[in-house]
A protein has these predicted regions:
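Glyoxalase I/VOC metalloenzyme domain signal
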Residues: 2-33, 37-59, 74-140, 156-198
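A short, aromatic/hydrophobic, helix- or strand-capping loop or linear motif
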Residues: 60-64, 144-148
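Short acidic/glycine-enriched loop/turn segments that link adjacent beta-strands
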Residues: 31, 148-151
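Short, charge-patterned binding micro-sites
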Residues: 65-70
Length: 198
């Protein structure tokens, strides 16, 4: 991504605060609600987050699938993985542990066996508008499908932001599940740190 040139050919720096920037339209969602890391060992990663940050409790998902899904234009389910999500304040912390070294969105960002930041998540009132806005910038669709009965996608914003951006359609099932994460974290006393949904 090119930096804006100033008079005399000088490149814009952080100190050039008087130069207006192009903001996203006012109706765009600007509040990230999730951060995700790809990890080589899910159980160890959960323990590190519990011990180091107090996030949690974490809810573990062992067999995650999408329907009507495409990976970079080819019909394909999401690459096999285990996952865990815990609440940390207003932010969901998601941990993804790929199973095997299958091609897909996890390995696109974090090569086999590695550890690293993967994506931020946005919960969208107007999924189609958010999707179109990201794609209009030249970003590519990495993966899209149905999860919990609602459209979800991963936009490849790695070239410009260094990570992917997940868009999730706001829907009653996700409201219930996300509410369970938040409720479990409120006043949590440390008991039952690793759970399953139910």
């Amino acid at each position: 991504m090119e930096t804006q040139a100033l008079p005399g050919g000088r490149r814009m720096t952080a100190s050039d605060t008087n130069i207006p920037v192009r903001l996203a339209p006012a109706n765009r969602n600007r509040s990230y609600m999730q951060m995700c890391w790809v990890v080589p060992d899910l159980d160890a990663a959960i323990r590190h987050w519990l011990d180091s940050t107090g996030a949690g409790p974490f809810f573990v998902f062992e067999d995650v699938h999408f329907t009507e899904s495409h990976y970079r234009g080819t019909p394909m389910d999401v690459a096999p993985h285990r996952a865990a999500i815990g609440q940390h304040g207003d932010m969901q912390i998601e941990l993804i542990c790929p199973v095997g070294d299958h091609p897909g969105i996890w390995r696109d960002v974090v090569p086999g066996g590695g550890f690293g930041f993967h994506h931020v998540g946005l919960y969208c009132d107007d999924y189609e508008a958010e999707r179109a806005a990201y794609l209009s910038t030249g970003a590519q669709m990495a993966f899209e499908g149905l999860m919990m009965g609602a459209r979800t996608c991963y936009i490849d914003t790695v070239p410009t932001l260094g990570f992917m951006t997940e868009l999730i359609t706001r829907n009653p099932v996700a409201d219930m599940v996300f509410g369970q994460f938040r409720t479990a974290a409120e006043g949590w006393d440390g008991r039952d740190p690793v759970r399953t949904l139910g």
